[in-house]
């Protein structure tokens, strides 16, 4: 392993420059994209002791895999995202990839250089096998019988996608939030298959407060009369109310107090005459209207059982549990170089949690670059376009490309 290296960057411009970049010049998109569905018939053993005998994963790819298969980047998604990382979904021009500002030609993860893979995690509800899928043993939706999953289970399933493409080692595995946990797990469980690990706005384990938020959200779903013990599919209903409340709770944790104050403050939605309160329990403030809208929208496209499953996977993630709480020991198997990025107003996974990872890596002598970005947008900052944040990621991937002997010009010449 190379000698220890730390590049620390705490980027703190004035507040009026921290909004997402809205410049007129933008790199190109990867264009219109469609997923492929990969079926795996080899049983997948799970951390719970159960196994899945067969399953499908929805996958999108961008860019070109080189002859050496050395330029592949895996993007891992967070709770409610999917394989659709970049570009515009075929047949739905409004469906733009959740990280389209990060992945594409000339973007920080440059698809003129790298072959990028997005995978919808096992148990999710966007095409991969999950609770809403048919259980082959019963001919009915899995529902509550779908096995509980962990981040490590996802990594093992993702590794089979890499095998499908003949990729022995990723140039980088990258993710934000829960996606960052998956990237970290890759570096620990399959160290020989990860050259660089990019962990953004993440944590090595959830705090009691975060587990508490997840539990309140789950109880909102489970106690909804439409939940039916997780077998609501058979009743032709959905626990909309519980899922909407769960999303409202989660959404608050994704925003910072500063961001909410700027967006909503105490502005009333439709004040009575002369700005008086309406003295009732319907929507009074703009923030209430916004949260109700977000909750209702979410409940129309996301599966409630998937929400339970993924939040529990979040709770269970704790790689240092096996080493008596010693994170450095848990990370001692890692062979990758690391980039960690945190955001000052992220109170869901605050910068101190990223620093915990950095300190553990330095203790092991692992090369690590760390950037702490001063941004007002809270946890969601990792999804937004910010010139300083993107510059950090761009510079890191340019370094990866140089180390691999890849440049945009070289790729174009090879083509």
From Swiss-Prot:
Identify the pathway: Amino-acid biosynthesis; L-methionine biosynthesis via de novo pathway; O-succinyl-L-homoserine from L-homoserine: step 1/1
Domain of life according to the entry: Bacteria
Gene3D superfamilies xrefs: 1.10.1740.110, alpha/beta hydrolase
Q: Write out the residues that bind substrate.
A: 247, 380
In this chain the AB hydrolase-1 domain maps to 71-386
Q: Does the keyword Hydrolase apply?
A: no
| Compositionally biased tracts (Polar residues) | 1-26
Q: What is its main location?
A: cytoplasm
Q: Which sites are catalytic? A: 177 (nucleophile), 346, 379
Top EC class, one word: transferase
InterPro entries per UniProt: AB_hydrolase_1, AB_hydrolase_fold, HAT_MetX-like
State whether it acts alone or in a complex, and with which partners, per the record.
Answer: Homodimer.
Q: What is the recorded function of this protein according to its Swiss-Prot or TrEMBL entry?
A: Transfers a succinyl group from succinyl-CoA to L-homoserine, forming succinyl-L-homoserine.
Task: Supply the name of the protein.
Answer: Homoserine O-succinyltransferase
